[in-house]
């Protein structure tokens, strides 16, 4: 059993990017789908889909590369962990590399980027940073 499924997801994406894989497959969960949705909306991944039957569903993430073969994901960092949760208010949401990256926040209105949460006046659990 994985103690931190979100960190496992980020590690699989990071390893897939370093190995220049086109697709990364991992066990699916609703939170992982929300994270993949935000990363797709922001252009870090090309797409995602849930495959398989209910008990053993898999999340397939299609990684995105430019014409030169460079990945759109330069780095991923887990912030809030099971042993130390990190919660932020609206004004405490960090800017990632001056706006080149995103912070992903789990709010009462769902999982969204830090800038979306800031515009809506929301805080929440700071899940990770992607740049």
UniProtKB/Swiss-Prot annotation:
Q: Please state the span of the N-terminal signal peptide per the UniProt entry.
A: none
Query: Does the keyword Ribosomal protein feature in the UniProt annotation?
Result: yes
Q: In Gene Ontology terms, what is one molecular function of this protein?
A: structural constituent of ribosome
Gene Ontology cellular-component terms for this entry are: ribonucleoprotein complex; ribosome
Task: Output the InterPro entries linked to this UniProt entry.
Answer: Ribosomal_uS8 (IPR000630), Ribosomal_uS8_sf (IPR035987)
Asked if Phosphoprotein is a keyword of the record, the answer is: no
Give an example GO biological process: translation
Keywords, A to Z, come to: Ribonucleoprotein, Ribosomal protein, RNA-binding, rRNA-binding
Q: How does it assemble?
A: Part of the 30S ribosomal subunit. Contacts proteins S5 and S12.
- Function, in words: One of the primary rRNA binding proteins, it binds directly to 16S rRNA central domain where it helps coordinate assembly of the platform of the 30S subunit.
Give the family this protein belongs to, as stated in its UniProt record: Belongs to the universal ribosomal protein uS8 family.
- Record-given protein name: Small ribosomal subunit protein uS8
Q: Which organism is it from?
A: Dehalococcoides mccartyi (strain ATCC BAA-2266 / KCTC 15142 / 195)
């Amino acid at each position: 059993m994985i103690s931190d499924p979100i960190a496992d997801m980020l590690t699989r994406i990071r390893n897939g990017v370093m190995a220049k894989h086109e697709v990364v497959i991992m066990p699916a969960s609703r939170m992982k789908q929300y994270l993949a949705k935000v990363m797709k909306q922001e252009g870090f991944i090309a797409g995602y889909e849930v495959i398989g039957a209910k008990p053993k569903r898999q999340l397939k993430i299609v990684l995105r590369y430019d014409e030169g073969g460079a990945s759109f994901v330069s780095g991923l960092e887990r912030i809030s962990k099971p042993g130390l949760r990190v919660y932020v208010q609206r004004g405490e949401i960090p800017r990632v590399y001056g706006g080149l990256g995103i912070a992903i926040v789990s709010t009462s209105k769902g999982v969204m980027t830090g800038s979306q949460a800031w515009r809506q006046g929301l805080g929440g659990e700071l899940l990770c940073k992607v740049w």
